[in-house]
A protein has these predicted regions:
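Alpha/beta catalytic cores of nucleotide-metabolism and tRNA/nucleoside-modifying enzymes
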Residues: 94-96, 109-126, 145, 149-160, ...
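Short, surface-exposed acidic/glycine-rich loop or hinge patches that mediate macromolecular interfaces
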Residues: 36-39, 62, 106, 163-164, ...
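Alpha/beta enzyme core
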Residues: 40-57, 61-73, 81-156
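Short secondary-structure boundary segments
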Residues: 1, 5, 61, 131, ...
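Hydrophobic alpha-helical membrane-association signature
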Residues: 80-83, 87, 218-219, 239
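Glycine-rich, positively charged N-terminal anion/phosphate-binding segment
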Residues: 1-51
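Pocket-edge positions in alpha/beta enzyme catalytic cores
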Residues: 34, 75-76, 139, 207, ...
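Hydrophobic faces of well-ordered beta-strands that scaffold small-molecule active sites
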Residues: 28-34, 57, 99-103, 129, ...
Length: 280
């Protein structure tokens, strides 16, 4: 998620700007998500980023973080539907790429269908709906009926998000809402296998959960990729939370987290993970 204002006014070699716009050559269908509330800045950023190899531009109108909504950005735009429509229309006019939008159910009530119609009029190509209001943040139960209402309100592809945790819940969302696609968020933290699990469930195929060895090997691969992206020092700090997610629920994971959080070097992290796996 990249701030349009930050992208336009921060030094182009700033660490955050560089890392948020970097792509792996193997990522051929990667979108770039922008956020902001000024239509002209969104348009300028979308135009400048259109030739960077991304497949589409996504506008974030769903982020609930106070540091974002406090500036009237993210899900705060759901309280200003006319401005949200203007932001989307500006992006659509500025780029040859498809423009999509991520929204929530609403700010404190379900206003998503009304906003979705405005976004459709603005020319966006798809809408993703997190079925919680901003006031819920990530608590409580996602109201999937909002996704269904958005699907009925527009003729665009609608992507459902919220409380998809496994293959069974993915299938239920598709059936109950009629949505065209699924978005998995927190359930993928430390669990990249969830996508294979969902695919297998929808196809009626068997699926085997990853072994401890596979979890650890994947965490190590993730560490190496993070180092290649950010350098060792930053990667080691960033990976602490990811490793905690990878080993969540395993015996001795709390003690492992304590050890990992105290290690400053990548090789120390590798050795610690391998030793942990060997003891299970």
């Amino acid at each position: 998620m990249l701030s349009a204002k930050g992208y336009l006014y921060a030094p182009r070699d700033a660490r955050a700007t560089v890392s948020l716009t970097r792509r792996d050559p193997r990522e051929t269908r990667l979108g770039l998500q922008l956020f902001g509330r000024e239509p002209d800045l969104i348009a300028r950023a979308a135009a400048e980023l259109s030739d960077k190899g991304f497949a589409f531009i996504d506008l974030n109108m769903g982020c609930p973080a106070p540091k974002i909504t406090g500036n009237g950005e993210g899900s705060a735009l759901m309280r200003e539907p006319e401005l949200a429509q203007a932001v989307a229309a500006a992006a659509v006019r500025a780029t040859h790429l498809p423009v999509t939008v991520k929204i929530r159910a609403g700010w404190d009530s379900a206003t998503a269908p009304e906003l979705a119609r405005r976004l459709q009029d603005a020319g966006v190509r798809a809408i993703a709906v997190h079925a919680r209001t901003r006031m819920q943040f990530y608590s409580g139960k996602a109201d999937w009926s909002v996704i269904q209402a958005v699907k009925r309100a527009v003729s665009l592809p609608v992507i459902g998000n919220g409380d998809i945790v496994d293959g069974e819940s993915a299938a239920r969302m598709l059936e109950e809402t009629g949505c065209d696609g699924l978005m998995v968020a927190r359930a993928a933290q430390g669990n990249p296998w969830i996508f294979a699990q969902i695919r297998a469930h929808l196809r009626g195929e068997p699926w085997n959960a990853p072994s401890v060895e596979e979890r650890v090997c994947t965490a190590l691969r993730h560490l190496d990729m993070q180092i290649a992206l950010d350098g060792e020092e930053h990667a080691v700090r960033e990976m602490r939370k990811h490793i905690a997610w990878y080993v969540s629920g395993l015996r001795g994971s709390a003690r492992l987290r304590e050890k990992i959080n105290a290690l400053p070097r990548a090789q120390q992290v590798r050795d610690c993970l391998l030793e942990y796996a060997a003891q299970l």
